[in-house]
Amino acid sequence: NYEILFLQGGASLQFSMVPLNLMSPKNKADYISTGSWSKKAIKEAKRVGTVNVAATTEEGEGENKFFKRIPKQGELKLDPDAAYVHFTSNNTIYGTQWMSEPEVGNVPLVCDASSDILHKPIDVSKYALIYAGAQKNIGPSGVVLVIIRKDMLERSLDSLHTMLNYKIQVENNSMYNTPNTF
């Protein structure tokens, strides 16, 4: 039911690839802001479509902004018509971590699991897409693991640039271009 990809660009490129591939056809998505990585993902997603920040736990003013907690389920202002809900499972910079996935109803759930992949069990069946930068728990920096539910591949538009298209990456076994060799 899932495809596994090893791609280039690390988790940071996924901040763009996720909305480019999954925002269609609704052109809007929910993001939960809990740290530096989710803020970067939000910034990139806004280049593609409408982003609803379903919750943020950012506190402070100016350069003294920080995150010290994960939002409670009741704080989430989710849009039932969103293309997906994105969250970062473990925010290492601020030391906050989700103990369980947010409840999102029937909206596909997307997770940046860079700090949690291979660290704890993850029930993949709860997700439409999981991505994880390799440098924390898997391998060399610049590589990213993407686990994508097969039905989500149909959202990738044919007009999307080849290297950014999950469907093309699956069709080419993650090797549309030459992968790193050592």
What is the predicted role of each segment?
Residues 2-27, 38-41:
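Conserved beta-loop-alpha segment that forms the PLP phosphate-binding cup at the N-terminus of a helix
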Residues 7-8, 32, 54-55, 86-89, ...:
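Short beta-strand segments
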Residues 20-26, 48, 124-128, 151:
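A glycine- and small-aliphatic-rich helix-loop capping segment at beta-alpha/alpha-beta transitions
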Residues 36-37, 56-61, 89-94, 114-117, ...:
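Short acidic/polar capping segments at secondary-structure boundaries
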Residues 45, 57-117:
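Active-site phosphate-binding strand-loop segment of PLP-dependent enzymes
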Residues 68-72, 95-101, 119-125, 141-144, ...:
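A short secondary-structure junction signal
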Residues 110, 124-135, 144:
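Conserved active-site segment immediately N-terminal to the catalytic lysine
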Residues 134-182:
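Active-site C-terminal subdomain of aminotransferase-like
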